[in-house]
Amino acid sequence: MTRSSSDRAIVVPAAQNALFTDSPFPTPDSRLIAGVDEAGRGPLAGPVAVAAVVFDPAKPRINGLDDSKQLSAERREQLYARIVDRALAWSVVLIDSEEIDRINIYQATMLGMRRAVEGVAHVAGFARIDGNRVPKGLPFPAEALIGGDALDRAIMAASIVAKVTRDRLMRELHAQHPEYRFDLHKGYSTPAHLAALQTHGPCPQHRRSFAPVRRALGLETAQTAWDVPCAPADGLLLAE
């Protein structure tokens, strides 16, 4: 696990949780809600990032929150700094491409959500998760909220933290694999990325369970991520 000295951002491997907190509470408070969202389910390369954010009710409200997809990169960075400064607790989990290929992207997202929630379980007592599924094995009750990243402020904050964390990592991966231009498309399936994939083949960051990557490998059957057989991970991945 690494921590940036300038902004306290945390990057973690798939097997770990990450947490930053200034919590004054010794035990969880059922009135405090963790917003949970992911970034990077669809790309052909890189991890899926899941964040959980619990706002500090004693700190000022953050203005300008929105779904991260509706914000410019510059605005996301600005809001990210405010979120991690004013949050009571926040966590970010990255599930890497190898784990995604092993258990599939859906299960990897469920795993990331559970680990992200566990990272703030010492202060929160309820989770509100963007989407229509709640992973099993959470430490406290939760609900799924379709379109939550446009409706709930804590989910909006989680979407921003997840997106900024992942985008920063993809820029770092660009330095290792400049031929793919991860800094521009962040691993998504753009024409330029597909062309680079055909020219250079996949790198270790590519998700081999995704059809375009499989085609670049010359496999006859290009299975999509959800067609690939799943292996269990911690036994707690299936959604309720």
From Swiss-Prot:
GO terms for biological process: DNA replication, removal of RNA primer; mismatch repair. Its cofactor is Mn(2+); Mg(2+). Coiled coil: none annotated. It is found in: Cytoplasm. Residues 31-222 form the RNase H type-2 domain. Manganese or magnesium. Binds 1 divalent metal ion per monomer in the absence of substrate. May bind a second metal ion after substrate binding. It catalyses: Endonucleolytic cleavage to 5'-phosphomonoester. This is Ribonuclease HII. It comes from Xanthomonas campestris pv. campestris (strain B100). The gene is rnhB.
